Amino acid sequence: VEVISATSDQMFKDFMPYSKHPELPVFDGELLMDVHGTGCYTSQAAMKLYNRQNEVLANAAENAAVAADWLGTATYPLNTLTDAWKRFIVHQFHDDLTGTSIPRAYEFSWNDELISLKQFAGVLTSSVSGVASQLDTRVKGTPVILHNAHSFPVTDLVEVVLDMPKSPKGVTVYDEKGKKVATQMLSYENGKARVLIAASVPASGYAVYDVREGG
């Protein structure tokens, strides 16, 4: 047996193009597990969506809560997280998550999933707020704190809504090093300015941006 360390898509790259491997079967419809499992990959899509959302949000909440507790800005919410984990993870079995329970069962399952989502979101919000309250936000304009819940650095467009008493002619945004970053004023209405920022935030970290009026 030869073990190769590679990315998840390497197998497909090695076999492409498909025309060179006519021996590979073609599946049309459900990808069955031998002779059973029809519908398990597609039935009850909402249940699968809620489950995945809980997995992602739970990880983000756990990471943020640990950081907040370690920094002393919030106490680790053990009971809340344990309750949220147990409530949604109990549905990760056959028949519930696979989509093969009776329809009536999902009225209860969806409720559990949504309760856990709310609990994880609450932990994430309070933990991030605790850490953010201790960051240095002494900037010339309006400070904007961004949090990256992923375990890898993220560079992406971020839309923020800022309170501004009057419509600005434009906005300029600077990062923590004082470097100007790409930004766009999207709209202004009722004292609220929608601003798009090309931001970069470290893995499981925070970044403070300085938003100033004027182009």
Where in the sequence are the language-model features?
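Short, hydrophobic/aromatic-enriched beta-strand segments in well-ordered soluble domains
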Residues: 207-215
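NTP-handling and nucleic-acid-processing catalytic cores
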Residues: 157-161
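Noncatalytic alpha-helical scaffolds and linker/capping helices
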Residues: 147-151
